[in-house]
């Protein structure tokens, strides 16, 4: 199986690194294209894959093509490569807001397409990726794509109408989490903790809390209640968060993200 990556930025690099680390595809069977020769050489040195500046070469030589350029570049790049794609290939799109119908229309001929939405924790092998196979993709082919996506984290298949919501919860929410960690650390610093230790405690607390929820399968509300002793300091702090609409504000942020993604 030969894989192609058109655009080899951070996200493509994370996907490639995960695939190689898991031994799913060898580096010499992975092709990547960059906009400049300098970037192509850097990608080759970093990942050991074959690189070029020719997008059409990658499209023509690959069984599965990952389109990893910026959303605003999609139309131009698709116009460039569409005549080099054939109906047996799978095109994997990682751009938010680009629907299967939009992609199919721009390609202009029958094409197997999988729409995916990874997030930045993929860079450390802990990504969350929602994916939606098009009608021409067989269950066996969808399984192959899922296995590739699972090389750098969790992969969840969804119906396409849910992809923008998944993009908000998975793709944009790391920014919310980083803000929360920063705010926790700021509170610790305000109470005398050194910055480095405050950030470490906050980050590990978020990591441990998430792991506990995933491993126990408990509802987050139940786990929250277990920490809140009657009349204790934790329930007092939860009350303060609720006074400032912590959950409501987060929910509105997710919905704002979805609205923006749909407008791209």
Language model: regions and residue ranges:
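Short pre-catalytic strand/loop immediately N-terminal to key active-site residues, enriched for Gly-Thr
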Residues: 114, 163-168, 220-225
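Rossmann-like NAD(P)(H) cofactor-binding subdomain of soluble oxidoreductases
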Residues: 37, 46-47, 55-60, 64-131, ...
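Internal alpha-helical scaffold of NAD(P)-dependent oxidoreductase catalytic cores
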Residues: 102-112, 128-165, 178-215, 264
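NAD(P)-dependent Rossmann-like dehydrogenase/reductase catalytic/cofactor-binding core
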Residues: 203-264
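Small-residue helix-packing motif on alpha-helices
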Residues: 30, 40, 58, 194-201, ...
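NAD(P)+-binding Rossmann beta1-loop-alpha1 motif at the extreme N-terminus of oxidoreductases
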Residues: 1-53, 60, 126-127, 189-190
């Amino acid at each position: 199986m030969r894989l192609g990556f058109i655009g080899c930025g951070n996200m493509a690099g994370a996907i490639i690194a995960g695939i190689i680390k898991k031994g799913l595809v060898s580096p010499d069977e992975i092709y990547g294209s960059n906009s400049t020769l300098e970037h192509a050489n850097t990608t080759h040195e970093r990942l050991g894959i074959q690189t070029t500046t020719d997008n059409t070469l990658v499209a023509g030589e690959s069984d599965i093509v990952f389109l990893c350029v910026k959303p605003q570049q999609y139309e131009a790049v698709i116009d460039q490569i569409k005549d080099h794609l054939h109906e047996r290939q799978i095109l994997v799109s990682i751009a938010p807001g680009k629907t299967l119908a939009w992609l199919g229309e721009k390609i202009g001929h029958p094409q197997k397409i999988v729409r995916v939405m990874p997030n930045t924790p993929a860079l450390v092998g802990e990504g969350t990726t929602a994916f939606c196979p098009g009608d021409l993709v067989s269950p066996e082919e969808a399984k192959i794509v899922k296995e590739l996506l699972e090389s750098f984290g969790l992969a969840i298949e969804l119906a396409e109408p849910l992809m923008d919501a998944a993009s908000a919860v998975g793709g944009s929410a790391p920014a919310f989490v980083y803000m929360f960690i920063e705010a926790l650390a700021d509170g610790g610093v305000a109470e005398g903790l050194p910055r480095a230790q405050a950030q470490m405690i906050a980050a590990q607390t978020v990591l441990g809390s998430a792991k506990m929820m995933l491993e126990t399968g408990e509802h987050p509300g139940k786990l929250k209640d277990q920490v809140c002793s009657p009349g204790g300091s934790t329930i007092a702090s939860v009350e303060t968060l609720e006074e400032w609409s912590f959950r409501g504000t987060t929910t509105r942020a997710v919905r704002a993200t979805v609205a923006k993604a749909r407008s791209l």
